[in-house]
């Protein structure tokens, strides 16, 4: 009997050893669960790879690792992401963005009235909830959930193309302030896109996971999330692998778009003062906006950035340069006349038919100018930071880790403002554009049973939590 047991034990050990050795040569399993960051301005999708423990943020067909959260409706199709962005200026009334601001949210008539005036598309009130009116062959109404579903479908298709297999399960992030209705509406949008949501995770918690803080010895974590259109500041308490969102504050109308607008207003003023006309063609305004965005991105790495945009002017629109700021349209221009810009305009207009001429507007923008135009906005970032410290009954010296999330936190002056306030450098070890999607992908890997095993983030519900907004 003892001999038989010895033989059996040896056989089991042999099988285990063979399995282990074979495992070294077998291809790694394909991820089964995707992680989604459905952002207000941009959205992205990632996966956690078993074996390597690495996260891959999946690009679209053109190599973009995030896509604009925009959906355009035309007579022939519905366009999403960058295709929608290209239609934003030529088809503004049918291009929906910021849908995340409205999903599952109940508005008072006064709140909704204030929101309606901010958008070129029609925002309708349906018993306190929002619907959008768009025209594609006929006038229809679409819900924020439907707009979200089109974005999620695009992300799902990107993941399926990359993985080479169908995808049905996902983990998705939402703002910590989202109530149950907003969370369920987000899940509904995912269901419309053919996705089953295994878990909803708060964006600050996802960011903390991306930075590895779910495994680190820290207690007080401050997450500053500054994207294209919103600022969110969250104070997290970490106990073991559990996160409690202790306080939240922010500004739902402060972000990279506002910084762009300041520079755009400045450039409009330069054009008007020199030529006496304003760009009016939609495609030229679109090119100007694209150029401004590129300048902003370049200034995160360099002290100066060049821009060049070809503009068209009608002969009867040409005027002499205005002699004072009083001749400028007051509702469109900042009044700063900063010396830190070197503008070079074509001396002559190249003539075209029908009395048109073209102007090559070229200029060099300095980082100092960009910072000067936006300094008051940069300082506003500190207001919600001070608020969460007050609500959390903490001094700024008691914060163990300050982490940055969102593309706008790349701006050097913003990092400097935060560093000066806390007296120490914020944690910038993770790409701020990808922090949330990276954390969500890690959680997706955990929920999908991927190995090597990670420490899951457990979120403690805080029913008394309310976000303080400074809009």
From Swiss-Prot:
The GO annotation for biological process reads: chaperone cofactor-dependent protein refolding; protein refolding
Which InterPro entries does this chain map to? ATPase_NBD, Heat_shock_70_CS, Hsp_70_fam, HSPA13
Which Pfam families would you find in this protein's record?
HSP70
Q: Among the entry's GO cellular component annotations, what is one?
A: nucleus
Q: Which UniProt keywords apply?
A: ATP-binding, Endoplasmic reticulum, Microsome, Nucleotide-binding, Signal
* Keyword Acetylation annotated: no
MF terms per GO, please?
ATP binding; ATP hydrolysis activity; ATP-dependent protein folding chaperone; heat shock protein binding; protein folding chaperone
Keyword Acyltransferase listed? The answer is: no
Which region is the signal sequence?
A: 1-22
Q: Where is this protein primarily located?
A: other
Q: Name where it's found.
A: Microsome; Endoplasmic reticulum
Task: Report the protein name in the record.
Answer: Heat shock 70 kDa protein 13
Q: What organism does the record attribute this protein to? A: Bos taurus (Bovine)
């Amino acid at each position: 009997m003892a001999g038989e047991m010895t033989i059996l034990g040896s056989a089991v050990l042999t099988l285990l050893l063979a399995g282990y050795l074979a495992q070294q040569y077998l291809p790694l399993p394909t991820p089964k669960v995707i992680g989604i960051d459905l952002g207000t301005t941009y959205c992205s999708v990632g996966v956690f790879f078993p074996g390597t423990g690495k996260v891959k943020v999946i690009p679209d067909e053109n190599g973009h690792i995030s896509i604009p959260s925009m959906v355009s409706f035309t007579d022939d199709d519905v366009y999403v992401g960058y295709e929608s962005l290209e239609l934003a200026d030529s088809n503004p009334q049918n291009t929906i963005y910021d849908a995340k601001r409205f999903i599952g949210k109940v508005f008072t008539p006064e709140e909704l009235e204030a929101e309606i005036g901010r958008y070129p598309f029609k925002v309708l009130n349906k018993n306190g909830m929002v619907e959008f009116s768009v025209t594609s062959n006929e006038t229809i109404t679409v819900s924020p959930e439907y707009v979200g579903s089109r974005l999620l479908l695009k992300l799902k298709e990107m993941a399926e193309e990359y993985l080479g297999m169908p995808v049905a399960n996902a983990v998705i992030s939402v703002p910590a302030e989202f109530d149950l209705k907003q969370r369920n509406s987000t899940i509904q949008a995912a269901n419309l896109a053919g996705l089953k949501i295994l878990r909803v995770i708060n964006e600050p918690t996802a960011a903390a996971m991306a930075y590895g803080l779910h495994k680190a010895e820290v207690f007080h974590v401050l997450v500053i999330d500054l994207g294209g259109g919103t600022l969110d500041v969250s104070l997290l308490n970490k106990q073991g692998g559990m996160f409690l969102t202790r306080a939240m504050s922010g500004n739902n109308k402060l972000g990279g778009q506002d910084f762009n607008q300041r520079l755009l207003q400045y450039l409009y003023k330069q054009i008007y003062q020199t030529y006496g006309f304003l760009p009016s063609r939609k495609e030229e305004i679109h090119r100007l906006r694209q150029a401004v965005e590129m300048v902003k991105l370049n200034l995160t790495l360099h002290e100066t950035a060049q821009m060049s945009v070809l503009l068209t002017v009608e002969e009867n629109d040409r005027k002499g340069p205005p002699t004072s700021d009083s001749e400028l349209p007051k509702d469109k221009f900042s009044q700063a006349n900063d010396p830190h810009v070197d503008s070079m305009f074509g001396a002559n207009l190249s003539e075209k038919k029908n009395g048109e001429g073209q102007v090559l507007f070229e200029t060099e923008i300095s980082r100092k100018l960009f910072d000067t135009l936006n300094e008051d906005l940069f300082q506003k970032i500190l207001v919600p930071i001070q608020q969460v410290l007050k609500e959390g009954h903490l001094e700024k010296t008691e914060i163990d880790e300050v982490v940055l999330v969102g593309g706008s936190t790349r701006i050097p002056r913003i990092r400097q403002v935060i560093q000066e306030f806390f007296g120490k450098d914020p944690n910038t070890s993770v790409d701020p554009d990808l922090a949330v999607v990276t954390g969500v992908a890690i959680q997706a890997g955990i929920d999908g049973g991927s190995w090597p095993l990670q420490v899951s983030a457990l979120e403690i519900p805080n029913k008394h939590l309310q976000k303080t907004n400074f809009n």
